[in-house]
């Protein structure tokens, strides 16, 4: 995303997003005010339909991960973004954050949602929002469950 796109996202602040899965809906609030580059990237991909018809390729007792167009954990959008962190956004149950390789600036499209607190990840991964509804859905996800679509929700 451009600096202008990130600046617009920062002005908007909190952005409601719905992740429609084969198990139900997950509602999250993205913190564009604190993580403008990361949120602008995620929203841009979502609005382009990048995440549509994807899968959760990784599910463990503490995390679910998706956003890879290949469904393997090795794919992405063809670019990476700079690591962005904020001390008030922690790796706690319900946090949504960007997955990446061992290089800090390697996130692209893959994201994770935590099913359990993982403070060990704080400061190393870009937490950019929080689930506000649908953690029961997150808890029921298994490998291969579909991400039908991700869209910015109506704020009303």
What are these model-derived regions, one by one?
Residues 1-156:
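Cyclophilin-like peptidyl-prolyl cis-trans isomerases
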């Amino acid at each position: 995303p451009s600096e202008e796109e990130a600046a617009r996202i920062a002005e908007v602040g909190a952005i409601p997003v719905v992740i429609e899965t084969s198990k139900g809906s997950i509602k999250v609030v993205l913190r564009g005010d604190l993580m403008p580059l990361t949120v602008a990237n995620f929203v841009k991909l979502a609005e382009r339909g990048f995440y549509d018809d994807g899968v959760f390729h990784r599910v463990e007792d503490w995390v679910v991960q998706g956003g890879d167009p290949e469904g393997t954990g090795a794919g992405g959008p063809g670019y990476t973004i700079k690591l962005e962190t904020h001390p008030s956004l922690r790796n706690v149950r319900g946090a949504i954050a960007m997955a990446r390789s061992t290089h800090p600036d390697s996130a692209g499209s893959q994201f994770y949602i935590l099913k359990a607190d993982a403070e060990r990840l704080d400061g190393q991964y870009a937490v950019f929002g929080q689930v506000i509804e649908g953690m029961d859905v997150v808890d029921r996800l298994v490998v291969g469950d579909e991400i039908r679509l991700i869209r910015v929700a109506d704020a009303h």
